[in-house]
């Protein structure tokens, strides 16, 4: 029996497709990118779509190409995501996100005693570690606190 495959989300003329997002993280990707109801371009997303490696999310953004900083933020919550740049309905560039080794001012330290959470004008600073067993974790350079599970919830 032949399996029927339908296109679930309309193709975009130009913009960005973020594929292979960790399942359940599409809304966090939109938040990372600062996309809200005020954003006027077309945005499509699919959550929990079947993929070769299990379930995944996909986000399509019409008329927007992502900056390096935006890609770094996405990598923190979905290090296996791929970015496709679309022009005239054709993929002109395809890249994997690259997990940065260091981030500054991107995530709030969850240690309430950390100096980056005080009234001082200090941006948070983290070294980024990835392991097969534990995934992505952030190590605060000020207080040495480790964040792993709640990265998405503490993005600035």
Curated annotation (Swiss-Prot):
Key words, A-Z: Metal-binding, Pyrimidine biosynthesis, Zinc
Residues where Zn(2+) binds: 109, 114, 140, 143
Gene Ontology process terms (BP): 'de novo' pyrimidine nucleobase biosynthetic process; pyrimidine nucleotide biosynthetic process
InterPro entries to which the protein is assigned, alphabetical: Asp_carbamoyltransf_reg_N (IPR020545), Asp_carbamoylTrfase_reg (IPR002801), Asp_carbamoyltrfase_reg_C (IPR020542), Asp_carbatrfase_reg_C_sf (IPR036792), Asp_carbatrfase_reg_N_sf (IPR036793)
SUPFAM superfamilies: Aspartate carbamoyltransferase, Regulatory-chain, C-terminal domain (SSF57825), Aspartate carbamoyltransferase, Regulatory-chain, N-terminal domain (SSF54893)
Gene Ontology CC terms: aspartate carbamoyltransferase complex
Function: Involved in allosteric regulation of aspartate carbamoyltransferase.
HAMAP family named in the record: Asp_carb_tr_reg
The protein's name in its UniProt record: Aspartate carbamoyltransferase regulatory chain
């Amino acid at each position: 029996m032949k399996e029927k495959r339908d296109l679930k989300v309309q193709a975009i003329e130009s913009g960005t497709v973020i594929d292979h997002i960790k399942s359940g993280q599409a809304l966090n990707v939109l938040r990372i990118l600062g996309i809200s109801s005020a954003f006027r371009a077309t945005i499509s997303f699919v959550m929990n779509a079947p993929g070769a490696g299990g379930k995944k999310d996909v986000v399509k953004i019409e008329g927007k190409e992502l900056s390096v900083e935006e890609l770094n933020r996405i990598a923190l919550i979905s290090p296996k995501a791929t970015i496709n740049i679309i022009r005239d309905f054709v993929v002109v560039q395809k890249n994997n996100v690259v997990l940065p080794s260091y981030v500054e001012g991107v995530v709030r330290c969850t240690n309430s005693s950390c100096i980056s959470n005080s009234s001082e004008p200090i941006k948070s600073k983290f070294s980024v570690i990835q392991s097969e067993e534990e995934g992505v974790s952030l190590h605060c350079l000020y207080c040495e606190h480790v964040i792993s599970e709640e990265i998405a919830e503490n993005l600035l």
